[in-house]
């Protein structure tokens, strides 16, 4: 098996910088669209054989150094008692607004409530045995709460922030319950065979540093501390957190995910020995090849040869990116960083 990705997570020497892409199993790949055309998004998430097929596609097509389980961060929320649909974005029929709503949420039994996730992990470990490691993942408690309270995607998640400020007891009870669920969900993935875990906090960066520290940090910290992490690296990605890396670092984990709004070298100075993942602007993949190569080189140069770099985009690959551009980017990373 290619262990570059895991070695880099632990800060060990590698022959070339490992690379994978957030949303690498996705709509930009014709092979993915072929599978997706036959089922709904939720059916794809809930059918282990199909989830396995699309998870492996980018490993074979792009030559990336890790696979990430095909699923959705909201998958474990449905069995908590919230009706979920995708139209095409996530929509909850009845958002959480009151303490009674929070009390009605149940903690799922992972083996019986989301068996398809764990079955996909087990299938993937067999499928990827001679290829690359498998990353399991989940949403951070705050980002999950954003969707559960708002009921759908939003630019500002005003309903959640209103709860945070005006109903702190309800907010705390909700975050506490989500954190407990999240811990059990990610530990179930680890038990099923996930070799690394990524925690996505897509909306954590919309808060001020003081609010992040007060309303988010304690829950993410508790989540990470509660994971069965023996030899399992944890990647913590908070989009938009470049101005508060010192605070986010306190949550724990082994690798800090970075978006493109921060200079990777300066981030490394702040984070010390902690490994990092990132941080190319996803829209660079629409550029001519020479620009892609220039930008890959810039990120590598900012790292200045320090161990513990996993190359990635600063957020998910966009659906309209030509696959050959992603292939070229992966090749650039390997070629330009080869020892």
Curated annotation (Swiss-Prot):
In the Enzyme Commission scheme, what number(s) does this protein have? 4.1.1.37
Q: Where is this site: Transition state stabilizer?
A: 72
Q: What does the function comment of this entry state?
A: Catalyzes the decarboxylation of four acetate groups of uroporphyrinogen-III to yield coproporphyrinogen-III.
Provide the residue positions that the database annotates as binding substrate.
23-27, 72, 147, 202, 315
Q: Which Gene3D superfamilies match?
A: 3.20.20.210
**PROSITE patterns from the xrefs?**
UROD_1, UROD_2
Instruction: Describe the protein's quaternary organization and the partners it interacts with.
Output: Homodimer.
Recorded GO CC terms: cytosol
Q: In which pathway does it act?
A: Porphyrin-containing compound metabolism; protoporphyrin-IX biosynthesis; coproporphyrinogen-III from 5-aminolevulinate: step 4/4
| A Pfam family this chain is assigned to | URO-D
Q: Which GO terms describe its biological process?
A: protoporphyrinogen IX biosynthetic process from glutamate
Which named protein is this? Uroporphyrinogen decarboxylase
Classification from the root reads:
Bacteria, Pseudomonadati, Thermodesulfobacteriota, Desulfuromonadia, Geobacterales
Q: What is its main location?
A: cytoplasm
Assigned protein family: Belongs to the uroporphyrinogen decarboxylase family.
Q: Indicate the enzyme's highest-level EC class.
A: lyase
Question: What SUPFAM superfamilies does its record include?
Answer: UROD/MetE-like (SSF51726)
**A GO MF label:** uroporphyrinogen decarboxylase activity
The record, for InterPro entries, names: UROD/MetE-like_sf, Uroporphyrinogen_deCO2ase_HemE, Uroporphyrinogen_deCOase
Which subcellular locations apply to this protein?
Cytoplasm
Keywords, A to Z? Cytoplasm, Decarboxylase, Lyase, Porphyrin biosynthesis
At the top level of its lineage, which domain of life is listed?
Bacteria
Q: So what does this thing catalyse?
A: uroporphyrinogen III + 4 H(+) = coproporphyrinogen III + 4 CO2
């Amino acid at each position: 098996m290619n262990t570059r990705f895991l070695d880099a997570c632990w800060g060990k020497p590698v022959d070339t910088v490992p690379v994978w892409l957030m949303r690498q199993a996705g709509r930009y790949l014709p092979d993915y669209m072929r599978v997706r055309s036959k089922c709904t998004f939720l059916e794809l998430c809930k059918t282990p054989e199909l989830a396995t097929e699309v998870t492996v596609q980018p490993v074979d097509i792009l030559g990336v150094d890790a696979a990430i389980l095909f699923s959705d961060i909201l998958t474990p929320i449905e069995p908590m008692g919230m009706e979920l649909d995708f139209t095409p974005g996530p929509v909850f029929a009845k958002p959480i607004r009151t303490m009674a709503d929070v009390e009605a949420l149940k903690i799922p039994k992972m083996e019986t409530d989301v068996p398809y996730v764990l079955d996909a992990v087990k299938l993937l470990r067999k499928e990827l045995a001679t290829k690359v490691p498998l990353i399991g993942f989940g949403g951070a408690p705050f980002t999950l709460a954003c969707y559960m309270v708002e009921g759908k995607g939003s630019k500002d998640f005003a309903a959640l922030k209103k709860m945070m400020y005006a109903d702190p007891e309800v907010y705390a009870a909700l975050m506490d319950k989500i954190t407990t669920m999240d811990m059990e969900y990610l530990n179930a993935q680890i038990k099923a065979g996930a070799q690394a875990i990524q925690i996505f906090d897509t909306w954590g960066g919309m808060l001020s540093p003081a609010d992040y520290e007060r309303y988010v940090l304690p829950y993410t910290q508790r989540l990470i501390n509660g994971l069965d992490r023996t030899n399992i690296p944890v990647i913590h990605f908070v989009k938009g957190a470049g101005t508060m890396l010192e605070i986010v670092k306190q949550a724990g984990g082994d690798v800090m995910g970075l978006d493109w709004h921060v200079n990777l070298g300066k981030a490394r100075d702040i984070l010390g020995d902690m490994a990092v993942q990132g941080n190319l602007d996803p829209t660079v993949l629409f550029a001519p090849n020479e620009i892609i190569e220039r930008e890959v080189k810039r990120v590598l140069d900012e790292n200045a040869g320090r161990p513990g770099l996993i190359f990635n985009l600063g957020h998910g690959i966009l659906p309209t990116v030509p696959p050959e551009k992603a292939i070229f980017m992966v090749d650039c990373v390997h070629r330009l960083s080869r020892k």
